Amino acid sequence: MITLGIDPGFARCGYAFIEAKNSAYKIVDSGLIETFQNQEYNQRLSFIYTQLDELIKKYKPNNAAIEELFFSKNTKTAIKVAEARGVIILALTLNNIEFQEYKPKEVKSQITGNGNANKDAMMKMVNLFTGSNIIQDDTADAVAIALAHASRNRIFNDIK
């Protein structure tokens, strides 16, 4: 089963496709969708959508998880991230991918056992769980979101 994790952003959107096999997790692909300030606003949103849509069509995830928007002190940034989340959710919906939203503290708690864990602790656990060496924050967050969702799905499936 392939799970897509997304750390939404306007300038940098982290993504990770992970595969759960038995009790192990393998990263199929992960990275960033990056937009740049010299691009028109609508082009940046379109680029996020088209890149994610291509990745979804390539890897055909069974489900997805996306980080909920937390309130930022910078309203302008929060609005841009919210709009990026909108095109991300559109890409998931048009590809018939069911998704779950997670608060950052939920992901941190599930991955590290501490809802207030820092970036270093998160990255360490992500790399431990996947046997990888991810050093980019947004990518690591996307992997963590995918891991949290895949793990939660596994628990619910075991209960059934």
Curated annotation (Swiss-Prot):
Keyword Iron annotated: no
Pfam families for this protein: RuvC
Cofactor: Mg(2+)
Keywords, in A-Z order: Cytoplasm, DNA damage, DNA recombination, DNA repair, DNA-binding, Endonuclease, Hydrolase, Magnesium, Metal-binding, Nuclease
Gene Ontology molecular function, alphabetical: crossover junction DNA endonuclease activity; DNA binding; magnesium ion binding
The record's free-text note on cofactor binding: Binds 2 Mg(2+) ion per subunit.
Subunit field text: Homodimer which binds Holliday junction (HJ) DNA. The HJ becomes 2-fold symmetrical on binding to RuvC with unstacked arms; it has a different conformation from HJ DNA in complex with RuvA. In the full resolvosome a probable DNA-RuvA(4)-RuvB(12)-RuvC(2) complex forms which resolves the HJ.
Role played: The RuvA-RuvB-RuvC complex processes Holliday junction (HJ) DNA during genetic recombination and DNA repair. Endonuclease that resolves HJ intermediates. Cleaves cruciform DNA by making single-stranded nicks across the HJ at symmetrical positions within the homologous arms, yielding a 5'-phosphate and a 3'-hydroxyl group; requires a central core of homology in the junction. The consensus cleavage sequence is 5'-(A/T)TT(C/G)-3'. Cleavage occurs on the 3'-side of the TT dinucleotide at the point of strand exchange.
Protein name listed in UniProt: Crossover junction endodeoxyribonuclease RuvC
UniProt organism field: Brachyspira hyodysenteriae (strain ATCC 49526 / WA1)
Gene (name only): ruvC
